Amino acid sequence: RDQTHEIVRTVSFAGDGSGRLPVPYGTEQTPPGEGAGQKIELPLRDAMVDRAFECWIHAGDIARAVDYPYDPPAPRHLHRMIDLAARMLPATLADRRRSGLAALSRDLVAAGAPGRSLRLEIEGEGGGEWFIALDSPGARASAEREVAHLALDGVEFCRLAAGHVSPAEAAAGRGGDREAVRDVLFAAASLSRL
């Protein structure tokens, strides 16, 4: 409710260029430690996509509970939801690493330099391909530094990001560095705690 209020408030005062304005989105609570209590902000455009994602997931939960058919969002909307989650993965990996929940960085590089990357292939409508920086959120993900590949269906990836499928249960094609694949699956699942 507070998130929705902040989104509407920001839009009503913003005017042109409002999609880039930051929207307060609560505080980091888990895992405890460094970073806990920090304010989370998302650009308005991303906050709207995140809110649409939450509404879709909750509506799907209700539909399943009453055995009512409920389709996923239109492909272009699903793509935006997947894109937001994929863009959040490098920072989430870094947070998990600082908390001891992910493997240590293997190859730190300067911000903007190409770093080790995982190719995330999302299949089905709304899918696409993203390269995820593994060792630093400031590194540039690239095909040349690909060390692992992870393929998931778009709806399955969203269910993983929503905490509705565990990383172990996610139906995924995997290749390359197993530790990197594992860390990305767990990072995706931890997005549900935002």
Regions found by a protein language model. Give the residues of each.
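Short, helix-capping/interhelical loops that line the mouth of catalytic, cofactor-
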Residues: 1-6
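Long, well-ordered core segments of solenoidal/helical folds
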Residues: 8-12
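Structured surface interface patches that mediate subunit assembly and partner/cofactor docking
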Residues: 13-194
